[in-house]
Amino acid sequence: MKTAAQIRELFLRFFEEKAHRRVPSSSLVPQNDPTLLFTNAGMNQFKDVFTGREKRDYSRATTAQKCVRAGGKHNDLENVGFTARHHTFFEMLGNFSFGDYFKKEAIAWAWELVTSERWLAISKERLAATVFAGEGTLPWDEEAYRLWEAQGVPPERIHKLGAKDNFWAMGDTGPCGPCSELHFFQGNDIPCAEEKAGRTCQGVACDCDRWLEIWNLVFMQFERGADGGLTPLPKPSIDTGAGLERMAAVVQGKRSNYDIDAFQSIIRAIEKLAGKRYGATDADDDVSMRVIADHARATTFLVGDGVLPANEGRGYVLRRIMRRAIRHGKRLGLERPFLADVCEAVMEEMGGAYPETRENRAFIVKVAGQEEESFRRTLDKGLAILETEMRKAIPPETHLGKPATPPPSAPRPVIDGKLAFQLYDTFGFPLDLTRVIAAERGFDVDEQGFDRNMAEQRARSEWKGSGEQAVGDLHKQIASELGETRFLGYEAPTARAEVKALLANGARAAKAARGDKVEVVTAATPFYGESGGQVGDQGSIAAPGGRVRVEDTRRPVPGLVTHVGVVEEGELAVGDLVELAVDDRRRDLIRANHSATHLLQLALRETLGDHVKQAGSIVAPDYLRFDFSHFQPLSEEELNAIERRVNELVRENAETETAVLKLEDARQSGAMMIFGEKYGDVVRVVRLGPSKELCGGTHVRRTGDIAFFKIGSEESIAAGVRRIVAYTGPQAIELSQREADELRRAAALFKAGAFEVAQKIEQTQKRVKDLERALDEAKGKIASAQSGDLAAQARDVKGAKVLAVRVQGDGKSLRELADKLRDRLGTGVVALGAEQDGKAILLVAVTKDLTARLKAGELVKEAAKLVGGSGGGKPDLAQAGGSDPAGLEKALAKVQELAVAALG
């Protein structure tokens, strides 16, 4: 039996023999494409090649591409585990032609690879093809039909389908074209919903799995703009996609993707953890194992590509995937963290094809473990919220000391749909879990309200691109017309160039006048456009009849540089020969910070370990910011070591070396790369002493030009990601001086030398603690004296004492007094109320022998409503606060009333 790994290799080798370049998978985080949430097709990394905006040194390519469909338009999340085919993560095998071959070769090679005994050896008799039937002004694809006939496919197995099935587009915009699919017949014994409804199975067009699509050949001929219009591509091209999991299922004779070897190895790891067998008798267990296997794959690869759990964007989708897996783990009875272990099984299965997963193993395992621990705590909070809301829905006297259940004679209360959705969205509760818990307690759930909130959330979370700098059609048009802007800024801060295009006040224009907000495009420029974390340059453009103040420099589409600013004098026109001048003093500050960022990354890896990976950066003139993977705060010793190491490298004054190399040569040289970054075939390598990185930014001539490096702050910004903000040169000196000034000021206040300040602070802290201890002792004596008097006021209820009284003091003194009173009462309930700083304080204590009948937390919650507040706590001790101290007497009376009712 051919394994999935062997099928992947056969596919790639087949096309290598057809003169295709084997190109590595791109990151799951799309580069330079704000229209995509995740990479979801093999052609994503070639989008600009298809549109002619990017050139490669090859015209044929083949890939095995990592893909995720779990958010935005392409969202398979909720189906995963319940069907044989749906996945969040999958591999897309593909071959591509960039204006080279077209339909004839694509169809012939697809047929050869699928049917040849040398390759995949799938039975010809079980294959069918589809072609575009035509729609609107687009004609049917007769050429593809004839080409399938030429391969020996009988006419009755070549089907014409409409645009819904046979016109492919990556998204709302971008490359598209008619397509032709290969389908594999699995058998008429597979159930069909159409037949169950008394209709006829639709064959290759049916949603049942009798005919399984295994390969889609897209004949890339158009680009769809934001207005929906189709523009012919410069050269017709080919984009094909074959899901590895589906192809492996067919080759291995499996009906479900989850039965192929690549999934079964992961499922075996889950079986071992759960002590259960996949495919035994419990269908729900099988669903959960499939969910966990799929979601562990998505987790492994998304985290490996730098996506981290978060509350928005890509991180939010990852968090939902991980939490869905964890929920299904609990369904399997996995009470201890397990997701990291399953991710290890994924890396074992797939690390050979994707070595980056093994390289990032420690990072992936740590993120998975931390998120699971966090979510398990969150899940418990969700259950507590649900319990609280159910208690609110029924009279408190019916549930004190026991789960909230309405009386049998009462109408069934309803859990609000908004709450049910909050539990789903925030705490990971699927609706069916809320429904089951509710039904056990005699509650119903407002499912229509849940659906309404779900629809609103989907509308909010729909991926609309990455913001105001999303690619615009005008920039695309200009880039298509003019090609790449030559960058001259490595050599000099000034240059002469012709104005090739102009945007004035957001519209394309031939000229611009004083006061106009403009984007100026020139044939070449010394200005660096914002990229790689380095901010764009500022400066000026001098024209024969005017002057532009350049406030920013951007790269709105790959290769195109625009100078953003305002016409300060006269006017500017397309065709003008202009003088471009970068603000070189500002550029020098940026150079120093950028070079320091490289040295900082080196020092971090030397000090903390090779798990440190760049997760983001900003290089500005006045500071640098560097985000990196690490799982705990840096100690003072580590921060000092990092700072010392960078300054050592600065003092070495090593000369900066740059080289332009082929990507593979750069990789072999050991140059640091940002994993997931999209690099061209030729890259620039920057060497600063022992630091060597791929980088297109501007740098100092020697490390000594950085002058001085100073860390300003270090903090956490996400699970497993830390952030350092640092300064160089004048800003670093200024920060050091400010710190020294503050130290001198503190020394003066303590009447001590600068190096004695820490000792003086420790001595002061000790004195404060001693005074607090003495104060507590005094309060304790007062409480003891008070408790004797107050205990006498307690009401006897069938052998238990109930005391509800207003006193003076803060929260701490109330707790001490309550402890004394409980000891004196023996068995009973104590409720104390006090006013402090215009606020109400309530405290309820219940002796241990009564907590089965009375819960302090429930009593204090009811009382808190009467002082305009809320609270909670343990069964034996709880506290609340409120904004209305005038209600204290009523609140204390309420506690006494509830306690007497429960005890009586």
From Swiss-Prot:
Q: Does the keyword Cytoplasm apply?
A: yes
Q: What is its EC number?
A: 6.1.1.7
Primary role: Catalyzes the attachment of alanine to tRNA(Ala) in a two-step reaction: alanine is first activated by ATP to form Ala-AMP and then transferred to the acceptor end of tRNA(Ala). Also edits incorrectly charged Ser-tRNA(Ala) and Gly-tRNA(Ala) via its editing domain.
Binding annotation for Zn(2+): H594, H598, C695, H699
Matching InterPro entries:
aa-tRNA-synth_II/BPL/LPL, Ala-tRNA-lgiase_IIc, Ala-tRNA-ligase_IIc_anticod-bd, Ala-tRNA-synth_IIc_core, Ala-tRNA-synth_IIc_N, Ala-tRNA_ligase, Ala_tRNA_ligase_euk/bac, DHHA1_dom
Its recorded reaction(s) are: tRNA(Ala) + L-alanine + ATP = L-alanyl-tRNA(Ala) + AMP + diphosphate
* Cofactor(s) demanded: Zn(2+)
SMART domains of this UniProt entry?
A: tRNA_SAD
Provide the coiled-coil residue spans.
none
Localization in the cell? Cytoplasm
Which UniProt keywords are present, listed alphabetically? Answer: Aminoacyl-tRNA synthetase, ATP-binding, Cytoplasm, Ligase, Metal-binding, Nucleotide-binding, Protein biosynthesis, RNA-binding, tRNA-binding, Zinc
Q: What is this protein called?
A: Alanine--tRNA ligase
Q: What is known of its domains?
A: Consists of three domains; the N-terminal catalytic domain, the editing domain and the C-terminal C-Ala domain. The editing domain removes incorrectly charged amino acids, while the C-Ala domain, along with tRNA(Ala), serves as a bridge to cooperatively bring together the editing and aminoacylation centers thus stimulating deacylation of misacylated tRNAs.
* Free-text cofactor note: Binds 1 zinc ion per subunit.
Write down the PANTHER family for this protein, in alphabetical order. Answer: ALANINE--TRNA LIGASE, CYTOPLASMIC (PTHR11777:SF9), ALANYL-TRNA SYNTHETASE (PTHR11777)
Task: Provide the family line.
Answer: Belongs to the class-II aminoacyl-tRNA synthetase family.
GO BP, sorted A to Z: alanyl-tRNA aminoacylation; negative regulation of DNA-templated transcription
UniProt entry tagged with the keyword Metal-binding: yes
Please name the GO terms that the record assigns under molecular function. alanine-tRNA ligase activity; aminoacyl-tRNA deacylase activity; ATP binding; tRNA binding; zinc ion binding
Q: Which GO terms describe its cellular component?
A: cytosol
A Pfam family annotated for this chain is DHHA1
Gene3D superfamilies in alphabetical order: 2.40.30.130, 3.10.310.40, 3.30.54.20, 6.10.250.550, Bira Bifunctional Protein, Domain 2, Threonyl-trna Synthetase, Chain A, domain 2
